[in-house]
């Protein structure tokens, strides 16, 4: 053997990377350069890893095709760094492809991580600020729930690293809200605020239906409800979902239970505003959403039991996710009660986004956030019914048509069809049209479907999107997810291109020689340590063999998918003496495969071939 390589555990230091790429101040950088990873790993191999710095594992995701992806969160002295994430492919050989964003040279801006403002003070500052911005609210009116403050590091719009608290809480009033704040952890200044309550403007039917959809029965027309029964009392609760009757209040509520004295366990409480039983609707649809995520993605939409709160307030024409539960109004003139499969999946999926990518609910990231929930709503409709109408809210919208449209979002008179129509401050429900249409175009391509489209968007949410992802970054994440799943990445890039989003991840078409199947390249020569690069792609999934033969001297063959191989980063490297080497790989369309010939010694007369 020419050399023995040591497999190293994947966990590298932010400090190591900073040393590898010297800069003068904090800044965000993209991690996809194999040479950067090579430097970081090399330095890591010689270091003792401090647990408070570097990257911590957030989750490990096993894709339906068996590939294992690991997502890491950057840490600085034990604090998470906002809007950073690195994803790596775990293979039998160790770590494969890497992609993500990290912050460099934080220590040039943040010297100490001991905050001058305590956690409770940060919450109090946020509450005071919220009340000042909403003077009509008295202290007695300001009823809050789920108060949270997390200490972290972020880079502001000027690339200045700051230690901050991310504070949020739910305001339980007739006009519910969930404000978010960045509070300076030293000065107590309010640096940024945004409204994070994930409202649903479009909804659908519930168990029993409504006057528009018609009446149907669970247990006859659809499977029965999964409930809990003790004696003659039934409760709407199971391992995935509990359903709460709010009784037209804006806070409180308890799990709905009813008398059930026979085997039918029949519940018809209660008909309202043209719907036959919104409580049944919510309970059934919540379970369907959990089942879809489990069956299709081998995951759960939430890390905790879902709470579905029904009959919220009086004549409330909306639905929202407050960070821990889903809440439905009964509608009035515009809507029937807002419980249906689309809305249930939509709002629960805001929770999924919050627990995965953490997309901020404003700007482009907010549009992606809202679109993912719309996409999940259509996916759940397909999972339940076997078909979709590509319209958001048609079943519970009392007028004709719907609230949002996938095929042409601008049909609603407000949403945009193309990224070129986006402007700062555009409502996230309207900017969602860009990703909604991209999903529609992708799902309707040959060899694609509602399910496959949902899979790539979901993996992007799990692994590649970050808090402030732009449209291009979000599209790149979906393309990378398609590649991970073995789907046609080029189809994803094309779908996003049609809506003005560059999903190519900034990849420049290769300028190296392109190999063609069955057409050998002959007479190759090089000196010791020289490197020559070639690329190839395939039109359909196939077994591809790359080989070198003949000639004198010693050339080594390297092959890697997605980026140039190096001596420490490759998918195949026979590493034999002489020039008779070959690599056989399972190639998929939409991926560029890179080939390197490296001179172990001077070589000449070598033939390179793709079969």
UniProtKB/Swiss-Prot annotation:
GO terms for molecular function: metal ion binding; metalloendopeptidase activity. Extracellular zinc metalloprotease involved in the virulence mechanism of V.anguillarum. Zn(2+) binds at residues 346, 350, 370. Keywords: Calcium, Hydrolase, Metal-binding, Metalloprotease, Protease, Secreted, Signal, Virulence, Zinc, Zymogen. This is Virulence metalloprotease. It comes from Vibrio anguillarum. It is an enzyme of class 3 (hydrolase). One of its GO terms (cellular component) is extracellular region. Its EC number is 3.4.24.-. Binds 1 Ca(2+) ion per subunit. Residues 1-25 form the signal peptide. The keyword Signal applies. The active site is at 347, 429 (proton donor). It comes from the Bacteria. Coiled coil: none annotated. Its cofactor is Ca(2+); Zn(2+). InterPro entries: FTP_domain, Peptidase_C_arc/bac, Peptidase_M4, Peptidase_M4/M1_CTD_sf, Peptidase_M4_C_domain, Peptidase_M4_domain, Zinc_Metalloprotease_M4. Seems to be more extensively processed. Residues 26-199 form a propeptide. The keyword Signal applies. The lineage of its organism: Bacteria, Pseudomonadati, Pseudomonadota, Gammaproteobacteria, Vibrionales. Belongs to the peptidase M4 family. GO terms for biological process: proteolysis. It is found in: Secreted.
């Amino acid at each position: 053997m020419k050399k023995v390589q040591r497999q190293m555990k994947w966990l590298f230091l932010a400090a190591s990377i900073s040393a590898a790429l010297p800069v003068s101040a904090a800044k965000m950088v993209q991690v996809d350069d194999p040479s950067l990873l090579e430097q970081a790993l090399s330095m890591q191999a010689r270091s003792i890893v401090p647990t408070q710095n570097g990257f911590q594992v957030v989750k490990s995701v096993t894709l339906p095709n068996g590939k294992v992806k690991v997502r890491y969160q950057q840490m600085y002295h034990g604090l998470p760094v906002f809007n950073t994430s690195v994803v790596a492919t775990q293979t039998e050989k160790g770590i494969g492809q890497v992609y993500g964003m990290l912050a460099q040279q934080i220590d040039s801006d943040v010297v100490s991580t001991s905050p001058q403002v305590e956690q409770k003070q940060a919450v109090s500052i946020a509450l005071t600020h919220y009340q000042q911005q909403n003077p009509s609210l008295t202290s007695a009116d300001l009823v809050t729930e789920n108060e949270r403050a997390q200490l972290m590091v972020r880079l502001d719009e000027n690339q200045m690293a700051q230690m901050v608290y991310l504070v949020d809480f739910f305001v339980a009033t007739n006009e519910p809200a969930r404000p978010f704040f960045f509070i300076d952890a030293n000065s107590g200044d309010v640096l940024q605020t945004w409204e994070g309550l994930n409202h649903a403007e479009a909804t659908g039917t519930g168990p029993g239906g409504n006057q528009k959809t018609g009446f149907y029965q669970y247990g006859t027309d659809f499977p029965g409800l999964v409930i809990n029964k003790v004696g003659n009392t039934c409760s709407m609760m199971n391992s995935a979902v509990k359903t709460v009757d709010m009784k037209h209040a804006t806070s409180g509520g308890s799990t709905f239970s009813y008398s059930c004295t026979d085997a039918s366990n029949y519940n018809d409480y209660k008909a309202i505003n043209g719907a036959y039983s919104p409580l049944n609707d919510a309970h059934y649809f919540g379970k369907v959403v959990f089942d879809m995520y489990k069956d299709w993605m081998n995951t759960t939409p939430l890390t905790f039991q879902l709470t579905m709160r029904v009959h919220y307030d009086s004549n409330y024409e909306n639905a929202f996710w407050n960070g821990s539960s889903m809440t439905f109004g009964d509608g009035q003139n515009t809507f029937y009660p807002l419980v249906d499969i689309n809305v249930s999946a939509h709002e629960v999926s805001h929770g999924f986004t919050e627990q995965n990518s953490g997309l901020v609910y404003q700007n482009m990231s907010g549009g992606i956030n809202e679109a993912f929930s719309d996409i999940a709503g259509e996916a759940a409709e397909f999972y339940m019914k076997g078909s979709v109408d590509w319209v958001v809210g048609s079943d519970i919208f009392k007028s004709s048509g719907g609230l949002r449209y996938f095929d042409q979002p601008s049909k609603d008179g407000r949403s945009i069809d193309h990224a070129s129509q986006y402007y700062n401050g555009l409502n996230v429900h309207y900017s969602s049209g860009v990703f909604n249409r991209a999903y529609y175009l992708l799902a309707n391509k040959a060899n694609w479907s509602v399910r496959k489209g949902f899979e790539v968007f979901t993996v992007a949410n799990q692994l590649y999107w970050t808090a402030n992802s732009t449209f291009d970054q979000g599209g790149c994440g979906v393309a990378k997810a398609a590649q991970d799943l073995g789907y046609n990445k080029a189809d994803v890039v094309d779908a996003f291109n049609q809506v003005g989003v560059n999903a190519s991840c900034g990849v420049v078409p290769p300028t190296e020689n392109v190999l063609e199947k069955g057409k050998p390249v002959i007479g190759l020569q090089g000196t010791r340590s020289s490197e020559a690069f070639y690329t190839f792609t395939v039109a359909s999934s196939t077994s591809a063999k790359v080989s070198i033969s003949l000639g004198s001297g010693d050339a080594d063959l390297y092959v890697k998918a997605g980026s140039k191989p190096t001596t420490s980063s490759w998918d195949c490297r026979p590493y034999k003496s002489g020039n008779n080497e070959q690599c056989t790989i399972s190639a998929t369309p939409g991926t560029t495969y890179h080939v390197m010939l490296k001179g172990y010694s001077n070589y000449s007369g070598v033939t390179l071939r793709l079969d």
